[in-house]
Each structure stands twice: as C-alpha cells, then as structure tokens.
UniProtKB/Swiss-Prot annotation:
Biological-process GO terms, alphabetical: glycolytic process
Family indicated by similarity: Belongs to the enolase family.
Catalytic residues of the enzyme: E204, K334
Gene behind this protein: eno
GO MF terms held by the record: magnesium ion binding; phosphopyruvate hydratase activity
Protein known as: Enolase
Organism per entry: Campylobacter fetus subsp. fetus (strain 82-40)
CDD domains: enolase (cd03313)
Entry cofactors: Mg(2+)
Length: 416
C-alpha cells in the first residue's frame, strides 16, 4: 500500500491553444505522477462531459472550475487512499460526482487525477506505466494509424471525410513501420507541392489540401506509398475516419454536395473497398443511425474493420448494446470519452472478450503527455491512432513507443 498524499492541478494549453488541466499526484513515499488531459473537436453526444468555465476568458473554454474541483473536493476524497488500488480511486470519484457522465465535477477533472495516480503508482514501484497497468501480458506494440490527410472538422477545406490514414502492416518492428509511414508522409508533401496544393496541416498533423472529392485523397496517398518505395495492400493499407455524425441531418448524409441515404453511403464504401486496400472505416455512419450501422456491418463487417467512435464513446454499456445487435466489429478507445483509467480498461476487456478489435486513440486537442502509448501496450489493443509524424504532441506518443520497443519488441504487424 502507498497512500496518496497530495493532489493539485493547474491550467495549461493544449495543441490547439485551448486550456486544459495538468494534474500532479504525490504519494507518501515521495513518488510523483503527472498527467495532461486531452480534448476533442468532433465529439460524440454521449461522451462524458468536460467542465468548461464559460464567460469571456479563452472564449469560454477555461477550466478553472474543473481545477477547483480537483484541488478541493477530489483531493479531499482521494488523499489518504491506496494509490495501488486504481479502481477504488476511480470508483470514489464516480461516486463523488453522482452522475453517469461526470456532469457535476467534470470528466476532465476526473481523468487527470486518474491518469496521474496510475503514473505515480508505477513510479512508486519503479516500473514502466505499461507494465504497471498491463502486467506480464503487456508485450505487444500496436500498429499505428497515421492521419496524413485531414478534412471535416479537423481542417478548413472542401473534403468531407475527416481523416485519411495509412497503416504500415508489413513490417517486423514498430520502428520500421514508423519509418515507412514517415517516408510516405514526406513523399505525400512533395506530391501535394508539385500539384500546387497547400501543405498546411490540420489539428492532427495531416495535410489539409482543397481536393475535389473524397476519393482524390485516396488516389494521392496511393501514389505517395508507391513513390516512397512501398507496396499498397501488402506493406501499407488505408483507413478512413468519416466522422459521419458531422454530416448527418437525421435522415440523410451531406456528401460532396449531395444528400445520400444510409444505403447509398454504404454502397459508396463498398465501391471504395473494392477499388483500394482499405483495412478500416471509422464512424462510417452517424451515432444516431443504428439501422444504417446494421446495413454497413452486414455488407462489410466480414471484410474490413468497422470502428465505432462517436457510436460507442468508449462506454461499456453502449458497446454491450452494439455487440448484442451485431453493430460494427471494433471500437475506438479514448479515455476522456468515459472519464477514468478503470472505466477505459473495463470497456477494452468487454470488447476483447467479444472479438471486437480495439484502437487506442488521441484527441485533436493533445499535449506532450504520452499516456496513451503506454496504455495501448498495457491493454494489447493492437492498434493506435495518434496523428501524423509532424507535430510534437503527436510524435511524443510515437517516441514513447520507440522507447517501449527497447523493452518489448513484439510488433503486431501483419498478425492483426
């Protein structure tokens, strides 16, 4: 047992210049854990709720109210508890809030404490965070999903789909996969320059050119893979995050200036998958369109990975409903969608028990905190999504995975 001695939080800035919370936990043996909470741009309706200040400062996005909750009521509740009992600490914060979405004290307040406690406990034992959270079975480095062209809510351009990604499968080591993806990214930059497109980047480091439709980014990425010296489909596959809830009006989807039904949009996906080596589609339909998701799952569920992000919001109860209804076959894992380390772990375990793949994920508003890199290895998620290799808050996660590779070199690669 090691007792939580002190908890404190301050306001810092995330990668978009918005305020967020940095939390520090000190244990009675002198061990310290710190964590910075991320924040999303496109968010699911059923996510745990961040607490923001409102008012004029930072356009209403300040987090001083949440920080006050950390420094007062959460600190009073958690100090004196055993840091090694993560679930008891997380359960205590959930009970303190009294709601199922942290609308009282703020999911951002809770998550910062939860992450920092885990770090402090790992430091107390002098073991890596991934080993502390995952035990002896934490041994596999995830296949990264690199977001290299941005559209939708992550960029100010004409592309509807939010993310166009590459996944380097055909490599024996994580470091080799990272190198390949980086070379494709740099090649893509040159191609876009040669075509006269902007190489300005979006929130997650991907380029955000004004392209004519949602297929053109795929064509350009295919060209970049080949020009970089790699084989599409064999070594590097494609993935899409459509973020279709942003395109849905309750009945139809606004795609390239046209209104499409769920069936018509699914047919588009089928054609794209027939034409290109697409491994994964995330949020292919709206979180409110479960009938459409059923159609998508029936048509493509046995061929590609269908990831629920806004659909499941890392929520164990919602995922259970999806499993029962045969919706999707994978889940995006974002700790701040659900609010604590323990709740995140419970959702991952439910998914894995039922054959759903898990993708550990960043948010568009990130920081230098690399917690999710360790978390992906700890939970053997097999995949991680944390942006392009061009912004330091994204590279912090990749660099941490490179460090972990020195200790546990198994890479999922083409075994996924």
């Amino acid at each position: 047992m090691v007792i939580v001695k002190k908890i404190s939080a301050i306001e810092v800035l995330d990668s978009r210049g918005n305020p967020t919370i940095k939390t520090k936990v000190e244990l009675c043996d002198g061990s310290i854990g710190e964590a910075i909470v991320p924040s999303g741009a496109s968010t699911g309706k059923r996510e745990a709720l961040e607490l923001r200040d409102g008012g004029e400062a930072f356009g209403g996005k300040g987090v001083l109210k949440a920080i006050k909750n950390v420094n007062s009521m959460i600190a009073e509740e958690i100090c004196g508890k055993d840091a090694y009992n993560q679930k008891a600490i997380d359960d205590a914060m959930l009970a303190l809030d009294g709601t199922d979405n942290y609308s009282r004290i703020g999911a951002n307040a809770v998550l910062g404490v939860s992450m920092a406690v885990a770090r402090a406990a790992a430091n107390s034992l002098n073991i890596p965070l991934y080993r502390y959270l995952g035990g002896a079975n934490a041994c596999t480095l995830p296949v990264p999903m690199f977001n290299i062209i941005n559209g939708g809510a992550h960029a100010n351009n004409s592309v509807d789909f939010q993310e166009f990604m590459i996944m380097p499968f055909g490599f024996s080591k994580f470091s080799n996969a990272l190198r390949a993806a980086t070379e494709v990214y740099q090649t893509l930059k040159k191609i876009l320059n040669d075509l006269g497109h902007s190489t300005a980047v979006g929130d997650e480091g991907g380029f955000a050119p004004n392209l004519k439709d949602n297929e053109e980014p795929i064509k350009i990425i295919m060209e970049a893979i080949k020009k970089a010296g790699y084989k599409p489909g064999e070594q590097i596959k494609l993935a899409l995050d459509v973020a279709s809830s942003e395109l849905y009006d309750g009945k139809t989807y606004q795609i390239e200036g046209k209104k499409l039904t769920s069936e018509e949009l699914v047919d588009r996906y089928v054609k794209l998958c027939d034409k290109y080596p697409i491994f994964s589609i995330e949020d292919g339909l709206s979180e409110d369109d479960w009938d459409g998701w059923k159609i998508l799952s029936e048509k493509l569920g046995d061929k590609i990975q269908l990831v629920g992000d806004d659909l499941f919001v890392t929520n164990e109860k919602i995922l259970k409903e999806g499993i029962e209804k045969g919706i999707a076959n994978a889940i995006l894992i974002k700790p701040n969608q659900i609010g604590s380390v323990s709740q995140t772990m419970q959702t991952v375990r439910l998914a894995q028990r039922n054959g759903y793949r898990c993708v550990m994920s960043h948010r568009s508003g990130e920081s230098e905190d690399s917690f999710i890199a360790d978390f992906a290895v700890a939970l053997n998620t097999g995949e991680i999504k944390t942006g392009a290799t061009s912004r330091s808050e994204r590279n912090a996660k990749y660099n941490r995975l490179l460090e972990i590779e020195l200790e546990t070199s198994e890479f999922l690669g083409d075994k996924i």
